[in-house]
Amino acid sequence: MKKYDVAAMGELLIDFTQNGYSDQGNPIFEANPGGAPCNVLAMLQKLGKNTVFLGKVGQDGFGYQLEKALKEMGIGTEGLCFDPTVHTTLAIVQNKDDGDRDFWFYRNPGADIMLCEDEIREELISDAKILHFGSLSLTDEPVRSATKKAVAAAEKAGLWISFDPNLRKPLWKSEALAKEQISYGFKHCQILKISDDELLWFTEETDFDRAVKRLQQEYGIALILLSMGKNGSAAYCGNQKVMVPAFVNKNTIETTGAGAVSYTHLRAHETDQYL
């Protein structure tokens, strides 16, 4: 019997999210726990699943805040490391009028980048059913090598692997490097969550169905989940396609983590039904 339904690795950071304006008209930013991998784990915990995180934060106030948040959610922190010299990664999230966001990062370096191969606890991975990761842990060394060690351990232990490109172009040295490393994620996953913008950017297609077919043929991905914002989402498995309309809120305020939420519900169902 596996101890964990899902193990995730990657960035754990502080999202400074705009939350109103001061009396002087300046934007006010709130320090929220963030990072796509742990957004997924947080939702899985709420759905009654057991999860564990592998990653690195700074040995600072923000790092301890993040550790506390994980423990309060019930996410396993056995794989969480602390860097004594590099601070916790920070993201500035500024909302647009349509509810979408702009991101700026303080990550040159940030603690999440500093996770090393010898800090990967393979026994945590082998004790899970699914390993989830994204491309932010492929942008730089040493975390890139650590991520690939975790993926190799998952494959050796027979886990399903899920991948979310979660493309943040400013964090990559070049788009060519981004495509190279995201292609690595495609090659090693059975479950892919990808946004409409990411799909068309990577494939250079203009049609979603044609772009998905290219990924299926080139990488053999079993299940592709496509998020399209206000246009809903779609799931592709072989020749089957299911479309779901969006739940549109005309007064959208904040969309950070929305993709992780929809992704999580389906993966919780997969854990129950297929693994």
Positions of PLM-derived features:
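Glycine-rich phosphate/adenosyl-contacting loop at the front of the ribokinase-like
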Residues: 1-76, 252
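Conserved N-terminal subdomain of the carbohydrate kinase-like
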Residues: 50-133
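Conserved phosphate/ATP/ADP-binding segment of small-molecule kinases
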Residues: 157, 171-243
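Short beta-strand/loop segments at the ligand-binding rim of alpha/beta enzyme cores
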Residues: 160-161
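Conserved small/polar residues in nucleotide/adenosyl-binding loops
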Residues: 264-271
